[in-house]
Every structure is written in structure tokens, then in C-alpha cells.
UniProtKB/Swiss-Prot annotation:
Residues 55-82 are annotated as: Disordered. Residues 55-64 have a biased composition (Polar residues). This is Putative uncharacterized protein DDB_G0279885.
Amino acid sequence: MMVSIIVPSLVKESSRESLLATTIDNSTLSTTPSPKLPTLEISGGSAKEIWTKIDQNTAPSTPSKILPKRLPSQSNLNNNNN
């Protein structure tokens, strides 16, 4: 099975590092239009303020479902089989 992985490349600029993301035109990949993703305008403020704003706009007010208890790790299962 072939799995393709897209890895962002870190590019050194004059005095800062920035991620270089390569975008591919959707028309070359498929005939169906991609869904419009919601965008969030963020201007200024500290990192904490920005994350608070992101959380307010994206996090659900209540969990959609209760998560199941954690399963035993794969290594434990392998040890039991030996």
C-alpha cells in the first residue's frame, strides 16, 4: 500500500524561521470543488489571547460524547501473548 506524506519544510529567512506550505490547485486533483473552510480573523494580542479567541470560536461548549476508558497499550498485549 502506498502512503504519501506531505511534509512542511522549514525555511530560514533573514531573522526568523517560517513554514513554507505548498498549495496545489484543486482543479488538477479532482473535478469536485473543495468545501469552503471557516476562517478566523485574529489581529494582535498575546498568544494567550489568540488561543482564547480560537477556543471560543472552535471548541464545542459541551463534549459531543464521553470518551471511552483508555485501552491497554499494544506492548502490554504483546507481552501477555508470549
